Amino acid sequence: MPKRGKKGAVVEDAEEPKTEPEAKKSKAGAKKNEKEAVGEGAVLYEDPPDQKTSPSGKSATLKICSWNVDGLRAWIKKKGLDWVKEEAPDILCLQETKCSENKLPVELQELSGLSHQYWSAPSDKEGYSGVGLLSRQCPLKVSYGIGEEEHDQEGRVIVAEYDAFVLVTAYVPNAGRGLVRLEYRQRWDEAFRKFLKGLASRKPLVLCGDLNVAHEEIDLRNPKGNKKNAGFTPQERQGFGELLQAVPLTDSFRHLYPNTAYAYTFWTYMMNARSKNVGWRLDYFLLSQSVLPALCDSKIRSKALGSDHCPITLYLAL
């Protein structure tokens, strides 16, 4: 339910899972709670140097970036485009754009190299959800949604087919505060899995975006305290595992860095979570098995600011 502020203004709950602070009983109790949440001190993630060659020694030929921008217009005001220009991806995928296509900021025209731009947003909800895909090369084909009316009303999926692979960028529905959309999320997961399996049967698949789940305990800072919260319920984690097995797909980051902890892509704005690195890994590049020989690196750009998520980058040698 929306919450009301002091003057009666409606404040919408955010879509991302949040770790709520516990009530303070005393100064000593507050310090204890903080230590339990973040440990004795913040442990930050250091992104290692980019690996730009595949296991066979082939140089990377494709760079894809994905970023949940938490509002396209606000992200641009926070200099998000400056990071994009410096990173210089061949393909840029954006989630939670919260912007209809007829209201896109003019600043996007500055991305002259990413001239092929595709957008999807809800037809009846301005300022909600939405995804974008910007590409240097013109895709062979572009489509929107997963082909089921129940799941294609909120602008959550763009599919772009290229010569060597199909790219899907997605903003997966959040189960919501109090898990009010968990049942819907489970229906989505089943339909999305079926859709991706069909795509992957015809051409190698790259799936990227905010998939709104921390798969394993290593993928969030406070697993014990979030097992009943959106993004880490047993149902969502099981659905993600079934996606990996059924399509099948491989988590590119965990494939390369199986034991790397404190690597997160989302931090709530509350309680200085980002500076303390109390986060979640919700953003992924998932790859078909046949793409793995081309995998050079899968990066988490945790120092890039502009949203409550950070961008992620994939290098492929195709």
From Swiss-Prot:
- Offer a single GO CC term for the protein: perinuclear region of cytoplasm
Q: What's this protein's name?
A: DNA repair nuclease/redox regulator APEX1
Report motif location: Nuclear localization signal (NLS): 8-13
Q: Which domain of life is it from?
A: Eukaryota
| Site (Transition state stabilizer) residue list | 212
UniProt feature, compositional bias: Basic and acidic residues: 16-38
Tissue distribution: The mitochondrial form is expressed in liver (at protein level). Thymus.
The family assignment reads:
Belongs to the DNA repair enzymes AP/ExoA family.
What Pfam families does this protein's entry cite? Answer: Exo_endo_phos
Question: Which UniProt keywords are present, listed alphabetically?
Answer: Acetylation, Activator, Cleavage on pair of basic residues, Cytoplasm, Disulfide bond, DNA damage, DNA recombination, DNA repair, DNA-binding, Endonuclease, Endoplasmic reticulum, Exonuclease, Hydrolase, Magnesium, Metal-binding, Mitochondrion, Nuclease, Nucleus, Phosphoprotein, Repressor, RNA-binding, S-nitrosylation, Transcription, Transcription regulation, Ubl conjugation
Q: Extract the ranges annotated as region (Necessary for interaction with NPM1 and for efficient rRNA binding).
A: 23-33
Function statement: Multifunctional protein that plays a central role in the cellular response to oxidative stress. The two major activities of APEX1 are DNA repair and redox regulation of transcriptional factors. Functions as an apurinic/apyrimidinic (AP) endodeoxyribonuclease in the DNA base excision repair (BER) pathway of DNA lesions induced by oxidative and alkylating agents. Initiates repair of AP sites in DNA by catalyzing hydrolytic incision of the phosphodiester backbone immediately adjacent to the damage, generating a single-strand break with 5'-deoxyribose phosphate and 3'-hydroxyl ends.
Q: How is it modified after translation?
A: Phosphorylated. Phosphorylation by kinase PKC or casein kinase CK2 results in enhanced redox activity that stimulates binding of the FOS/JUN AP-1 complex to its cognate binding site. AP-endodeoxyribonuclease activity is not affected by CK2-mediated phosphorylation. Phosphorylation of Thr-233 by CDK5 in response to MPP(+)/MPTP (1-methyl-4-phenylpyridinium) reduces AP-endodeoxyribonuclease activity resulting in accumulation of DNA damage and contributing to neuronal death. Acetylated on Lys-6 and Lys-7. Acetylation is increased by the transcriptional coactivator EP300 acetyltransferase, genotoxic agents like H(2)O(2) and methyl methanesulfonate (MMS). Acetylation increases its binding affinity to the negative calcium response element (nCaRE) DNA promoter. The acetylated form induces a stronger binding of YBX1 to the Y-box sequence in the MDR1 promoter than the unacetylated form. Deacetylated on lysines. Lys-6 and Lys-7 are deacetylated by SIRT1.
Which factors induce or repress this protein, as stated in its UniProt record?
Answer: By several DNA damaging agents.
What the entry lists under InterPro entries is as follows:
AP_endonuc_1 (IPR004808), AP_endonuclease_F1_BS (IPR020847), AP_endonuclease_F1_CS (IPR020848), Endo/exonu/phosph_ase_sf (IPR036691), Endo/exonuclease/phosphatase (IPR005135)
Where S-nitrosocysteine occurs, the residues are 65, 93, 310
- The UniProt entry annotates the motif Nuclear export signal (NES) at 64-80
Entry keyword DNA repair = yes
Known regulation of activity: NPM1 stimulates endodeoxyribonuclease activity on double-stranded DNA with AP sites, but inhibits endoribonuclease activity on single-stranded RNA containing AP sites.
Q: Which cofactor does it need?
A: Mg(2+); Mn(2+)
Q: Where is this region: Disordered?
A: 1-59
One GO biological process term is: regulation of apoptotic process
Residues of the active site are 171, 210 (proton donor/acceptor)
Where in the cell does this protein reside? Nucleus; Nucleus, Nucleolus; Nucleus speckle; Endoplasmic reticulum
The record's annotation in CDD domains points to:
Ape1-like_AP-endo
The PTM Phosphoserine maps to 54
